[in-house]
Amino acid sequence: MRIWSLHPSLLDCRALVACWRETLLAQKVLRGLTRGYTNHPQLIRFRAYPQPLEAVAAYLAGLADEADARGYSFNRALIGAGEHGAGENGADKTESPYASVPLIPVPLGQLEYELTFLQHKVAGRDPEWEHRLNKRLAARGELAACAHPLFEAVPGTIEPWEKTKDF
């Protein structure tokens, strides 16, 4: 499971679609609707949040916004916060999903690690996207601008829950 801290516009097609599916799974886990993945490290930051389902819904909305921008069709009815299930927060795109959800801090070291990880993955599977990614990174300028809209970049190293790999 990979729930990227990076802005969805930086993710290639495979990463964006996989992140959507895996975050929908995370939403189910946080609702207690599945027995698997309950101790997955990627869920730690959402569980630490006062309203984890609302945070996951806002995160999913950010992915869906990017999907819309690319002409993909992610089912927003699957986004839902609170106890009532799917569709509660996701169907209406007119209201910003981030308006009532305080930002979650993400260390710059985590963003840097994830960006390196993404670049490594993209280099092996989609050279065309690698070129686009480099242009998008240059346009953003600083690493802090590379965070998903739900996250706020703060000083720090890689998150303790991250299972790092050498590239």
Task: State where each predicted segment sits.
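Sequence termini and other peripheral, non-core segments
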Residues: 1-16, 22-25, 29-33, 47-85, ...
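Conserved, mostly hydrophobic/aromatic
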Residues: 40
